[in-house]
């Protein structure tokens, strides 16, 4: 895969128009134009949407029906019922919540009104249902769009070659400065050589993250698939667009003979219980050493499934074959995505809730198991999990030893900056993206360097840095990985793939040696030819995320070395 693809479709932000300004107040006589799914809404005379103060009011029946809902007024309950094949919403007139499919409730800003025997609801009613809404105060034009139609429209403009229209109509001023029409065109057209002709966009999924709608779908091309992720603000403005290789199915494997697996619960009795899998040798005598596997970044399952890999499955089985019990579990943000990645949580969500607390609970679970030796519980953390391992240990994990798999003692934003610059440096000087994106990345770097000067409240309100919430990064750097690691006197094994382009063998591996130089129990192993997931790959697309899409397993030598190291500590 060309590195140009990785850059424009992963690093570039493609944005629509300006943001909301201060609310504009109008009388109730002002009428707003209205569209549904990019089509003008046709309504009977006298039934148009209107602006009441700073609230846009829309006739619920024609809008709901245009969106494909059956809309019914239940007189006995003074309620509105909106039904589709899959969803049902009930709104009691005069209330401030919408009941979804008889279960959850959605908060609603404003209340319905009756005008000329028609029920009007605030535009925010449809936003609460997960639809995309907008209002242009200068033209008095409002809109409601389903996430599927929005995504289809964006990719449709790209596929039709209407780059200038997309740029003129949908980009905001800042993104027009960063991404030219020619850069947009070259980014989309660069897909053709590797993935072929665009075919269709599959059904989308959505979630709310820090006030924005994140839409994900698989885009099918004639030679392969790509995952498309777009991010939309609260005025239907596109704030992000990226394409990444869609994952092929991971290598299917059966549990090896001589092993057994049990389903357990990490954090049982807490507000966030997590499904876990404990892998054990089927026949053993005496108490066993054990390992907690701690995930990298992102919302991942107990196998740490990423693209076409299942690294935690491979490690768990390989270690259990060496007489070591292994606990792996679903990440909290994987099990409770809306709770931990939604609007309200995003500003205060940190690695403590995402990773640290659950790893400590997992260690406690192993220490209580009578089949296992409580004095020989180890942590093996991959990527972000490796970075956080010293903190998890210090905050209560109290492990017998730590295995750091492709971790780093540096700040997270430093690594993200290097990852982006690595892609930029690989571009031809003639590529217009090179200068434009370098400028954008340098701007993000300036924001990152300013994090330490912000108060907690300022960080919670600050814009994202490299697409990561500012407070998340600030809180993480307040628990300095290098400083915590310097205090370690227990056994530590640092493992690094030489071909890792996410954590750099030439930078991070030597830094670990420097940080741990006073720890005589620290050991270091580097593996030629292995990538970030400790998979050996040298085919097409090597050095880009394309290689992660080729199904494979963790190199057996890595797992053998892990097991030998743990058993050596145990024998002592």
Predicted regions and their residues:
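Short beta-strand element of the alpha/beta-hydrolase
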Residues: 286-296
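Cap/lid segment of the alpha/beta-hydrolase catalytic domain
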Residues: 294-353, 424, 536-547
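Short beta-strand/loop motif that positions the catalytic acidic residue
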Residues: 488, 494-496
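Short solvent-exposed beta->alpha transition segments
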Residues: 164-212
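Primary recognition of N-terminal secretory signal peptides and signal-anchoring hydrophobic helices
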Residues: 4-6, 18-149
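Alpha/beta-hydrolase active-site loop
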Residues: 347-369
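Accessory cap/linker subdomain of secreted extracellular hydrolases
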Residues: 401-487
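N-terminal cap/lid segment of alpha/beta-hydrolase-fold proteins
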Residues: 247-286
């Amino acid at each position: 895969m060309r590195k140009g693809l990785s850059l424009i479709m992963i690093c570039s932000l493609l944005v629509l128009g300006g943001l909301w300004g201060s609310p504009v107040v109008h009388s109730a006589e002002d009428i707003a134009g209205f569209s549904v799914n990019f089509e003008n809404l046709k309504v009977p005379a006298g039934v148009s949407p209107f602006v009441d103060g700073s609230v846009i009011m829309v006739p619920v029946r024609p809008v709901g029906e245009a969106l494909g809902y059956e809309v019914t007024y239940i007189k006995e309950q003074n309620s509105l019922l909106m039904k589709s094949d899959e969803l049902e919403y009930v709104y009691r007139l005069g209330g401030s919540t919408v009941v979804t499919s008889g279960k959850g409730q959605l908060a609603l800003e404003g209340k319905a009104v009756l005008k000329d025997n028609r029920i009007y609801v605030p535009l925010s009613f449809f936003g609460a249902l997960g639809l995309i809404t907008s209002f242009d105060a200068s033209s008095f034009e409002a809109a409601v769009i389903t996430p599927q139609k929005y995504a289809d429209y964006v990719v449709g403009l790209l596929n039709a070659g209407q780059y200038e229209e997309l740029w003129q109509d949908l980009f905001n001023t800042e993104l027009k400065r960063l991404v030219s029409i020619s850069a947009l065109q070259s980014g989309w057209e660069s897909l053709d050589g590797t993935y072929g002709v665009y075919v269709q966009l599959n059904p989308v999924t959505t979630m709310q993250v820090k006030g924005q709608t994140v839409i994900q779908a698989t885009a099918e091309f004639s030679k392969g698939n790509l995952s498309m992720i777009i991010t939309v603000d609260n005025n239907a403005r596109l704030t992000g667009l990226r394409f990444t290789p869609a994952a092929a199915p991971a290598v299917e494997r059966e549990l090896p003979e001589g092993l057994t697996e049990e389903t357990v619960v990490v954090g049982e009795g807490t507000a966030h219980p997590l499904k876990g899998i404990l892998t054990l040798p089927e026949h053993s005598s005496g108490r066993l050493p054990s390992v907690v596997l701690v995930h990298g970044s992102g919302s991942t399952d107990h196998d740490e499934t990423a693209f076409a890999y299942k690294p935690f499955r491979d490690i768990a089985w390989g270690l259990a074959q060496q007489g070591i019990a292994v606990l792996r579990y679903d990440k909290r943000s994987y099990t409770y995505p809306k709770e931990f990645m939604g609007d309200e949580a995003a500003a205060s969500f940190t690695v403590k809730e995402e990773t640290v607390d659950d790893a400590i609970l997992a260690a406690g679970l192993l220490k209580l198991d009578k089949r296992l030796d409580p004095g020989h519980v180890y942590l093996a953390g991959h990527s972000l999990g490796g970075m956080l391992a010293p903190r998890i240990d210090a905050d209560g994990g109290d492990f017998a030893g730590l295995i750091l798999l492709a971790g780093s003692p540096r700040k997270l934003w430093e690594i993200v900056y290097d990852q982006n610059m690595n892609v930029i440096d690989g571009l031809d000087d003639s590529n217009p993206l090179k200068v434009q994106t370098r400028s954008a990345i340098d701007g993000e770097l300036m924001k990152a360097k300013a994090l330490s000067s912000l108060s907690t409240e300022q960080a919670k309100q600050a814009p994202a840095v490299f697409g990561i919430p500012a407070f998340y990064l600030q809180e993480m750097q307040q628990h300095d990985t290098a400083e915590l690691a310097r205090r370690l006197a227990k056994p530590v094994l640092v493992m690094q793939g030489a071909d890792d382009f996410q954590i750099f063998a030439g930078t991070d591996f030597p830094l670990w040696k420097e940080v741990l130089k006073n720890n005589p129990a620290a050991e270091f192993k580097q593996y030629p030819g292995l990538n970030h997931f400790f998979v050996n790959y040298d085919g097409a697309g090597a050095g880009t995320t394309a290689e992660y899409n080729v199904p494979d397993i963790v190199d057996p030598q890595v797992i053998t070395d892990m097991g030998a190291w743990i058993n050596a500590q145990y024998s002592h």
